[in-house]
């Protein structure tokens, strides 16, 4: 199965184009608290879990480098969600919506 991807450089444009998109950070809670993309919800990845997300929303998923978010997106798609992964993860994201803990 091909995993749909969004470029980290185009993520801000994508989110602006599709208002209401859900951004899901699948890293640990500790990693999320250190830094995350503004408006992202933190749902740590747990292989085989049943995702409980709004079915009518487009879902953008990211992790540290992209591998975990791709696995999560694969499972989300199998469960009927419209999801895509941020290529390269938060490591590659340089957009204006990056939030660091204070």
Please tell me what each predicted stretch does.
Residues 1-22, 28-58, 65-102:
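Rhodanese-like catalytic fold shared by cysteine-dependent sulfurtransferases
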């Amino acid at each position: 199965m091909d995993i749909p991807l969004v470029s980290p450089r185009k993520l801000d444009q994508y989110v602006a184009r599709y208002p209401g998109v859900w951004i899901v950070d699948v890293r640990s809670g500790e990693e999320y608290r250190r830094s995350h993309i503004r408006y992202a919800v933190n749902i740590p990845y747990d292989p085989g879990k049943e995702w409980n997300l709004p079915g009518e929303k487009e879902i953008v998923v990211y992790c540290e480098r992209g591998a975990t978010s791709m696995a999560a997106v694969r499972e989300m798609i199998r469960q009927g969600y419209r999801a895509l992964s941020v290529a390269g993860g938060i490591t590659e994201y340089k957009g204006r919506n990056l939030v660091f803990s204070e």
